Structures are given as structure tokens and as C-alpha cells.
Amino acid sequence: MMISPSNNSIPNPKLLKEQINAEFAKQKGTFALAFKNLQTGEEILINERVNFHAASTMKTPVLIEAYKQAAAGKFTITDPILVKNEFNSIVDGSLYSLNAEDDSDSVLYTKIGTKLPVYDLLYLMIIKSSNLATNIIIDLVGAQNVNKTMREMGAKDIQVLRGVEDSKAFQKGLNNTTTAYDQMLIFNEMAMGRIVDKKASDAMINILIDQAFNDKIPAQLPKDVKVAHKTGWIKGINHDAGIVYLPDGRKYVLILLSKELVDDKAGVSAMANVSKMIYDYFIGQ
């Protein structure tokens, strides 16, 4: 299928970068962007090495580690695992629990005490951004192992220190962090089928395509464009990171990170606008 260039197509990367920076400059906050054309290798980078609180973008590295350990035979993706709501703080080992009303997926809390397949928890962790599922999976795979895998992949600035809602760790400034560059790196590897193997990479992509939160990268894109992505948000912070698939088979990686947002809603709109600029530039090539 051929895609006709948009009337809004931007002719060159220098002009595109200027327009993106102008869009970001309308907002009070700090933004980062990493774009990679997976056909040509072209990259467009803005604040790509600046550290951000990862929010729920840390769940993609956790997903990767789960598939890596499953491939190594530590468990299978279909193994049953206990749904629990009791976790240890990384500060002192004390127990803490999550509140259903603070989670973007409250349904899993009705399953506490039962067992579900590992896959079901991975799926909820990504598409619903379930914090409870995330903490259960982190207990299964180990945060240190996630970091080790990130280093092996070359992502030196992704830090997954802990699960979600560890308030003692938060108070001590022990947070999960990321950069746009490292997110671009891991999604590039996934898109190329190089995380574990093509089958595992494709399985992760199929989960990410089902993402329920679509207010940033996909928001202004045509409906036949598929996006395999993971969002993240806490007050003043909004992220989206993933792979954009055009119906003609072409694809690109796009990472959008933000922090210190005074107006979250306006920041999200700016990111959706920038995603459309990138799309218009890409199809105009």
C-alpha cells in the first residue's frame, strides 16, 4: 500500500526540529524526543540524554526481562503465579501494599489470593499499566536483573530500582529513571526482533499494540497506523514510547518524555501535536 505525503509534510530535519522545539516552548516544562527511522537509520534527538522519572515506562524493561527469563527456562509465560498485594520496600524490607483506587487497573485486586498466568499479568502491566501486576512481576524477575539486561542492551541510563508505590524509597529519592535515548534503543531492538529472538520480540510487540492509553503518540495519527507503545504519567510527568507501524510496512521508533509540566493536559496535547509532525515528516520522505 502506498501512502501519499500529507499536505503538512515537513521537507527537512532541521526545519522539523525547529517546529518541534517551538511546539514544546509553548509549554512550561522540560521535554525530550528521540525518533529513529527504522528503514534508513535517521535519528532526530532533543534532550535525549536528560534523565526523567520513568513513571510507567519502566514497565517495558520489566516486560523484556520476563521474556528473557522465560526463554532461559526460569519459568514459562503460561505458568500460574499468585496474585498478592504485599511487597517489601527496598529501603528497609518493610511491607507495603497498593491501593486499588490509586491504580489504573482496579479489577486485578479482586483476584488477590488466586493464581493467574504470568502472561495475563504482563498484559495488564502494559495495556492497563497495572501497578499491582507490575510489582508481582518485579518480585518474580528481580529489579537488579532488569538493570543488568538493560546494561547488556546498551541502555546505561534506564534504572529500575523498585516496584510502584514504595513510599519509603520515594521519600529517599530512590526512583526509577530513564532517558529518551535509552527508550529508543530498546524499542529499536524490539522492532528488529533482537530481544531474545524474533518470536519473543513479536510477542511483546503484540502486547504493546493493545495499549489502552492512546492520548499522545497515536492521538492524531490515522486509524490504520498501529502503535506498539507504553505510556507513563504522574503529576507533572507524561511519557509515551514505542514503535509506529504504517500500513505499507514502514516503521519508526518515537519516544516523547516530559517533566515539570505546569499544565499536564496542555503538555499531552503538545506531545500529540509533535507526534503528528513526526508522522507527516516520515510519510513525506
What residue spans do the PLM features occupy?
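Beta-lactamase-like hydrolase cores
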Residues: 7-53
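Conserved catalytic neighborhood of penicillin-recognizing serine enzymes
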Residues: 88-135
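Active-site SXXK
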Residues: 41, 53-86, 254
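Extracytoplasmic
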Residues: 26-30, 47-49, 53-57, 76-78, ...
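Residue-level preference for non-acidic, small/hydrophobic
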Residues: 41, 59-66, 125, 150, ...
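Acidic helix-start/capping segments at beta-turn-to-alpha-helix junctions
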Residues: 77-99, 141-142
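Structured C-terminal helix/loop/strand segments within mature extracytoplasmic catalytic/sensor domains
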Residues: 12-23, 140-142, 185-215, 231-285
